[in-house]
Amino acid sequence: MESKDHNGLRSKVEFIIEFEEGKLFRDLIDAIKQINDRGWFKFNKSGFGYSQYSEENKIWIDITINGSGLKYEFKCNDPDYAVELEIKSIKNNLSQVSAKDGIKIYKLLNEQNIYFQRTSKLVNVSKSVCCMAIPNVVKEHQEYNPPEYAEGEDKPTITVGSIEFKKELSSIIKTGSQINEIHITKNSVTFAGANQEKTSTAVAQFDANPGIKISGLERYSPVISKKEFNISIEVSKKVLKYFSKISTLTKSNGIKLFVQENLPLKIVSNFGTHGTIKSYIDIGQN
């Protein structure tokens, strides 16, 4: 790690991004690093995207951010720019960013380093410039193409308030659960946690009504019929923590869960007012 003072910055950058809401970006990094320490950022003139697949947790994260409103500026000869970064290192560099700070992210021409600069709105607060080496720069990487969901009643959509979503998942995490599962039926998604002895259990059920009810794990029994389906997948506590943290980014827009038989569980949330965060959990039918 080193500090530098880049005078005349804009005349020699390959790309630059400015965030007025630095804490929002910090919270985004904090969420996605729960799943994996590495992922792909793609930058272009209209905004930026991020994608990450965790083989261990069987979850894909796909983020699309509109650059408008972010003081976003892109400068590069290539129409797209892809960089593999260590998310854990980014998080460490952003730990001091507060709600009143902004962030600049940029890369200088002919350098293999990316820089994160804290830009504070407070008087007499120094601006820190942190240098982090990029493991590698790539032009291409494999995209994830999730299957399309059918229209109509075969595509149940469950909308949950972000505050309720965070509250109920947090209750499961706090049980110290060692067994975590997601149960899916045509009209509901249930997150459940229990310890090995099942002496401590917690369940958060989100219905298509919509609605929420908490009960003991042993009392949850999905109805199975020709018109219903029952899918169950074990997930790690990292996955639960990830969803708990992204709920803080949605503000008043809520979280949407898309449920369809034989397809990944699709969970859509927002990055403030600037873009969407799509998460796909690979599921196996019982």
Show which residues each predicted segment covers.
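DNA polymerase sliding clamps and clamp-related checkpoint/processivity subunits
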Residues: 1-33, 38-175, 181-286
